[in-house]
UniProtKB/Swiss-Prot annotation:
Entry coiled-coil feature ranges: none
Protein name: Large ribosomal subunit protein bL25
Keywords: Ribonucleoprotein, Ribosomal protein, RNA-binding, rRNA-binding
UniProt xrefs under Pfam families: Ribosomal_L25p (PF01386)
One Gene Ontology term, aspect cellular component: ribosome
Ribonucleoprotein recorded as keyword: yes
UniProt record similarity statement: Belongs to the bacterial ribosomal protein bL25 family.
Keyword match rRNA-binding: yes
Organism: Thermosynechococcus vestitus (strain NIES-2133 / IAM M-273 / BP-1)
Biological processes, Gene Ontology terms: translation
InterPro entries reported for this sequence: Rbsml_bL25/Gln-tRNA_synth_N, Ribosomal_bL25/Gln-tRNA_synth, Ribosomal_bL25_short, Ribosomal_L25_dom
Length: 101
């Protein structure tokens, strides 16, 4: 893949319910990896997530993830994609931070 992929995530509010997020155009996501002490709950824009899932190969394609709420930004891979089996809508994304971040 010649073009680079990027997505922006925001911290997920502690009281936010997944279905309410989806109704408001957001997808729950999580960021974890060897350089991150504990997993970080995020939300990403549904349309941006759909484009990312369409273009990225899970566990292979490097993606630039930025989180304006945190001083963290770096390269991740799309570790897991969860989708509704009948509706074919995204439910959850898991991002794995690469070790060099």
């Amino acid at each position: 893949m010649s073009r680079s992929l990027a997505i922006e995530g925001q911290l997920r509010p502690a009281d936010a319910k997944p279905n309410a997020l989806r109704r408001n155009g957001k997808i729950p996501a999580v960021l974890y990896g060897p350089t991150i002490e504990s997993s970080i709950s995020l939300v990403v824009d549904t349309r941006a997530a759909e484009l990312l899932v369409r273009d990225a190969r899970p566990q292979k394609t490097p993606i630039q993830l930025s989180i304006p709420d945190l001083p963290w930004q770096g390269t991740v891979v799309l570790q897991e994609v969860q989708a509704h089996p009948a509706k074919d809508t995204l439910y959850h994304l898991s991002f794995l931070a690469k070790a060099e971040n």
